[in-house]
Amino acid sequence: MVPFGGWEMPLAYPSGTVAEHRACRNSAVAFDVSHLGTVRVDGGDAFEHLQRSLSNDLTRVHPGRAQYTHLLDEDGFVVDDLIVWWVDDERFDVMPNASNTTDVIEAIGGRDVTEDRAVIAIQGPEARSRLARVSSEAATVHRFAVRSFEWAGATCLVAGTGYTGEEGVECAVPAEVATAFWEAVLGQGVVPAGLGARDTLRLEAGLPLHGHELGPGITPLQAGLGWVIGWDKGPFTGRAALEEERANGPARRLRGFVADGRQPLRDGSLLCEGEEQVGILTSGNFSPMRERGIGLGFVDADARLLDGDAITIVQRGRELPARLVRPPLWPVREESE
């Protein structure tokens, strides 16, 4: 167990991170992601309030859908990246990162219902077929759809979301049935997986992690996430700063990297073109599928490097040859919306 965002979390189960990772790519795994916050925002003004508070445009979706979005500060920097579950006309369940729940509540209001439920993510190409033996209702939810389902006499929620680059769902179940639901899912041959596999999977999928690719000093445009900005809607926090950055172009951009060898890449390593530093690695690890070191990092906009170009990663005094690769760093298989 390791501390993570104020929670004690399993880094891996006995099978180990690499086996858990490959199980997600080839069959199905389950993550207990109950550390993710749930902030409930409801009432007749909830929609308009979130439209003003968050970057994405809620008119792009409707009740029964989920949306990825950002909470920004006035400088356009990412306070947190969130998933909003639009449960019904006047109820939104906002899912912040573990350590940011308090900051999110201060910014958007709502009430913390994190400890009332557990969130179980079932991911992988066989996730739905195995989950169907536990709940056919939960297994048939489409990507980024949200619906309620009944299980063991309790009302639960399921969304077609995840953080792995695979098909799958995330189930929010009341705390009193959480252990039974977890055991029922594992009883269908679903492999339990920990934080280690969750990180290598999201890294292969090219997905950002708050505190690494997102956070203070980083804007959505720098992170290549301009699509989470609702340019066509009205005012929202950080809009003016983002409009200025869009006009001038971001000073740096997030890129993907694949090393020539198996050495795991590490965050904080320098990205160099010849003798010149052109960026910094923000996340790195070993890819169990590529069997190479992989990473994400920011490269200065004036470096003019293209996908496929060679780059040197200076890591703990060693020079590791690598190439720029447009994320994802492994083919994703998420179903279409």
Residue positions per predicted region:
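Conserved, structured C-terminal
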Residues: 1-5, 9-12, 85-337
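Acidic, proline/glycine-enriched N-terminal capping motif
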Residues: 1-72, 77, 196
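Short amphipathic beta-strand starts and helix->beta connectors
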Residues: 17-26, 71-81, 106, 150-157, ...
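Acidic active-site catalytic centers that drive phospho-/nucleotidyl reactions
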Residues: 32, 81, 170
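Well-ordered mid-protein domain cores that form the structural environment of catalytic cofactors
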Residues: 60-104
